[in-house]
A protein has these predicted regions:
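Transmembrane alpha-helical segments in multi-pass inner-membrane proteins
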Residues: 236, 243, 253-319
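Membrane-helix/interface signature in polytopic inner-membrane proteins
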Residues: 197-237
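Transmembrane alpha-helices
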Residues: 141, 222, 227-251, 263
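Hydrophobic alpha-helical segments embedded in the membrane of multi-pass proteins
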Residues: 65-75, 90-94, 123-126, 145-148, ...
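Alpha-helical transmembrane segments within multi-pass membrane transporters and channels
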Residues: 107-147, 292-293
């Protein structure tokens, strides 16, 4: 009797273990949860109202979130360093009044007024960063105080009046152009470009890696040669400039300089960042996640409005979403340990 030999298997004994790796990565990716929440929200509102799933409504959502989205990019940078900025909406409002009034009264040409607004908002960010890093003071206290400072300056400088009769360059980004089945504003393209730029900076540059390192452990980052003081101040300053860009987008969308603008944008920007999977404890998150979070906020507000839900209940639901998102983040952090 001759023994027959079985040819050796060419497949790796770990093939079955490796096969689901890609699927597992997708399921455990930080943006998977927010993306699933966005799709579920879209499905719910599509079934709840016939007006939701239309090209015109999607265009409206994009227009509504471009301002908060730009604020949320700056907020993401700060939260990644384990900070927070409660002043973003007020700083944006003050920047919008500076730009609008300087241009409307002819004090400065429109482009110079825009540049001044960016410098002013960047200055607020710089001051926040210096107070947080050099004194040092808790980011919550610093930005809460700066919120009141910017709010007061907005009403003082505007004299409680809405600035109208703005020159064309200030509202140009609010103009629309056809794209597929809907219309898109030029300002929306600016916001998307900013998301892409900051996503690249955080994921593919040394500066971005330093931001994550600072959020994970300031002491470890310092021991590894990262200039944490300069980095923190730089992050707050960049965020301030982004608030200035948001001010211009706000003007282009509304066509006026409104001293009452931005009062709910602080909460909305933080909500978008948290819903997008960025940890309030720093060191974990992404601009892509924030982009999804911004869309979640926009879809919820738009869908609830179409359903006739009162604004106070929309605020209530937004608050609940924030608490749930932070709770999930805290639970996942404990499991990771």
């Amino acid at each position: 009797m001759t023994a027959t030999s079985t040819p050796p298997s060419t497949s790796s004994p770990y093939a079955e273990l490796k096969a689901p790796t890609t699927a597992r990565r997708l399921l455990t990716a930080p943006t998977t949860g927010p993306l699933a929440a966005l799709l579920l929200a879209c499905a719910f509102f599509s079934l709840s109202t016939d007006q939701f799933l239309t090209g015109g409504n999607f265009s409206l959502i994009i227009q509504q979130v471009m301002v908060v989205g730009t604020l949320a990019i700056g907020q993401t940078l700060i939260i990644l360093t384990a900070g927070i900025d409660l002043s973003c909406g007020a700083v944006m409002a003050f920047g919008s009044i500076v730009i609008a009034r300087m241009a409307a009264e002819g004090t400065l040409p429109p482009l110079a007024a825009i540049a001044l607004g960016l410098v002013v908002c960047g200055g607020f960010g710089l001051l926040n960063g210096v107070l947080v890093q050099k004194i040092p003071l808790p980011p919550f206290i610093v930005t809460l105080g700066m919120l009141n400072v910017a709010f007061a300056l907005t009403h003082i400088y505007s004299e409680e009046q809405t600035v109208t009769n703005l020159p064309g360059p200030l509202t140009a980004l609010g103009e629309t152009f056809p794209l597929g089945y809907t219309d898109v504003t030029y300002g929306s393209l600016v916001t998307i470009a900013l998301f892409l730029l900051l996503a690249y900076a955080l994921s593919s540059t040394g500066w971005g890696r330093h931001v994550y390192a600072l959020g994970n452990s300031p002491e470890a980052a310092r021991l590894n040669g990262i200039r944490t003081s300069r980095l923190t101040i730089g992050v707050y300053t960049v965020a301030g400039v982004l608030y200035g860009i948001a001010a211009l987008l706000l003007i282009s969308r509304t066509g006026v300089g409104d001293p009452q603008a931005g009062q709910t944008d602080n909460l909305d920007s933080i909500t978008a960042v948290v819903l997008g999977g960025t940890s309030l404890f720093g060191g974990r998150g992404s601009v892509l996640g924030t982009f999804i979070g911004v869309l979640i906020v926009g879809v919820f507000r738009n869908g609830l409005q179409l359903m006739g839900v009162a604004s106070i209940y929309q605020t209530l639901i937004t608050g609940v979403l924030v608490i749930l998102a932070v709770t999930v983040d805290q639970i996942s952090r404990k499991k990771a340990r």
